[in-house]
Amino acid sequence: MNQFKVISKFNPTGDQPKAIKSIAKGIEKREKFQTLIGVTGSGKTFTMANIIEKVQKPTLVLAHNKTLAAQLCSEFREFFPNNAVEYFVSYYDYYQPEAYVAQSDTYIEKDASINDEIDKLRHSATSALFERKDVIIVASVSCIYGLGNPEEYKKLTISLREGMEKDRDEIIKKLVEIQYERNDIDFSRGTFRVKGDVLDIFPASSSSKAVRVEFFGDEIDRIKEFDVLTGETITKLKHISIFPASHFATSKDRLEVAIKDIEEELEERVKELVSQDKILEAQRLKQRTNFDIEMMREVGYCTGIENYSRVLDGRAKGTPPQTLLDYFPQDFLLFIDESHVTLPQVKAMQAGDKSRKDSLVEYGFRLPCAYDNRPLTFKEFENKLNQVVFVSATPAKYELEYSTNTAEQVIRPTGLLDPEIIVKPVKGQIDDLYTSIQETIKRGFRILVTTLTKKMAEDLTDYLKEMGVKTRYLHSDIDTIERMKIIHDLRKGEFHVLVGINLLREGLDIPEVALVTILDADKEGFLRSETSLIQTVGRAARNSESKVIMYGDVITKSMEKTIKETNRRRKIQMEYNEEYGIVPKTIIKDIREVIQISDIAEERKEYDNLNEALKSYNNDIDKLIEKYEEEMKEAAQNLQFEKAAHLRDVIYKLKKDKETEL
């Protein structure tokens, strides 16, 4: 069995060894909840990697968005090149859920664009859990959504061995049952092809490698893995497991039982609707459900089959759905990254889903069993947990209340200190701010200014521009790409001051920033809470010459706690630096890290100028669509989701224009 092994030229330093030892010991002692408090730049991911190596448990790392999950996955792959590090997020590039708006009698059909590459990665993640123990899966909150029964998934797996007596046609039938399609021409993921005694299978978890099974009569003579593009043999295999092409694949026996249950529920619900004098709704439900049943009987699945997942799984009404958490063995470990943001997200998921389903069930679009195709409630999520480590610079009440052990990671290996905090009165704050900005610009650094309202942010931006200061305003209407472009320009020095409201917290690490100012710091509220203030102060923690100015006439409890905590961390780091002779030094990351993303914003302009693009293709709209489709697939393969989604929208527009012309 493969062991987790961290590969790195660095060894744990500062607070890392102590934190690793403390958390690992807690895991060995069966502590259920622990917290790792780690400041910005202290190497929390490296600590997590070393904990995984120590405890040797299959691990799930939960992040609060796709981008952060991709970043963490990339870092873990660097630390664990010889282990399975997988990525599991929502596979929708675009998703419009099914809904019904009663006021306008509008039914909105489910519309989705599935990213084939992410679907492959999801299959790779689940199959890895059945094949090995050394698995790390980095996931978004998508992992608390229904995924199909892991027992059924495992039961439907086709196991093939060299020398095994197996009828070729029987294997083909089983492949169809687990939702593989026969395609002798377009051989792609989730398909198989047959030529004489040779059966080629393209696994759902692969993008470039397929499996060739050669028969001699009814015996499997040879199994080999080959490159789909070149046809060259990669390796000879003694055994291969073919996992289902869909997580919702169901055996024929189970499907027949499920169909009977669906028919019974339909009969009951139709009677109920008729008794309420809802004849139209009853007729609609009967028609839609019978069509789905017919599809299931014919091809084994139907559009929206997930709405019947509770019946297909044989679960009782109201019981929690099976999720990625159920695919893990019982002794798995869970890290919840940025837990102060991620946990509230998990808590909010189920309520929104139920309110949408209410009208679908009430007006006869769905059976009541659709309610159980949902994310986990927070209580259900808690019940599925084994051992959890919350990771945050500012853990919330829940984490601190439930944790029986807390490890702190304050010391940064770089020696950088938390910034000095200065409190100044509100009166004359704009004049003082202007003076502080000029001083910081002279030293060659940048400035972040956080305000309480949109109006104030806009007015302040206009004022600073009038005073000759190069200023930009980062507001909530700006999309991810444009936001990254603005940050890129700030780092390059295209402008010097960035003004924002609630946008200067997690994930905005700019080493060139030497001044962070917080206007109206004494106005208590969620934007000026202790958590919010500590996160905002952390934005200045990448520069050795940085400071934070809080403008307020009184020192609130949140301000007091933030100042006290920052000073405590400064003291610890200063003592460490003195002991080991470390001189704090700003580490300026290569600006190219952001250029890759900001380049997409430039590409958008190119894609949006369709008239120019068509001219360069002699007005051949089909050729242009073909080019953009290739670029979209390439972008998705490189996990450039924003670019892929934008290209999809451009292609859709071109196809619409083409239809109009016809």
Swiss-Prot record:
Forms a heterotetramer with UvrA during the search for lesions. Interacts with UvrC in an incision complex. The gene is uvrB. The beta-hairpin motif is involved in DNA binding. The keyword Lyase does not apply. GO terms for cellular component: cytoplasm; excinuclease repair complex. A motif (Beta-hairpin) lies at residues 91-114. Gene3D superfamilies: P-loop containing nucleotide triphosphate hydrolases, UVR domain. Residues 25-182 form the Helicase ATP-binding domain. It comes from Clostridium botulinum (strain Kyoto / Type A2). The lineage of its organism: Bacteria, Bacillati, Bacillota, Clostridia, Eubacteriales. InterPro entries: Helicase/UvrB_N (IPR006935), Helicase_ATP-bd (IPR014001), Helicase_C-like (IPR001650), P-loop_NTPase (IPR027417), UVR_dom (IPR001943), UVR_dom_sf (IPR036876), UvrB (IPR004807), UvrB_inter (IPR041471). This is UvrABC system protein B. HAMAP family: UvrB. It is found in: Cytoplasm. Residues 429-595 form the Helicase C-terminal domain. Residues 622-657 form the UVR domain. SUPFAM superfamilies: C-terminal UvrC-binding domain of UvrB, P-loop containing nucleoside triphosphate hydrolases. Belongs to the UvrB family. GO terms for molecular function: ATP binding; ATP hydrolysis activity; DNA binding; excinuclease ABC activity; helicase activity. It comes from the Bacteria. The UvrABC repair system catalyzes the recognition and processing of DNA lesions. A damage recognition complex composed of 2 UvrA and 2 UvrB subunits scans DNA for abnormalities. Upon binding of the UvrA(2)B(2) complex to a putative damaged site, the DNA wraps around one UvrB monomer. DNA wrap is dependent on ATP binding by UvrB and probably causes local melting of the DNA helix, facilitating insertion of UvrB beta-hairpin between the DNA strands. Then UvrB probes one DNA strand for the presence of a lesion. GO terms for biological process: nucleotide-excision repair; SOS response. Pfam families: Helicase_C (PF00271), ResIII (PF04851), UVR (PF02151), UvrB (PF12344), UvrB_inter (PF17757). Keywords: ATP-binding, Cytoplasm, DNA damage, DNA excision, DNA repair, Excision nuclease, Helicase, Hydrolase, Nucleotide-binding, SOS response. The keyword DNA damage applies.
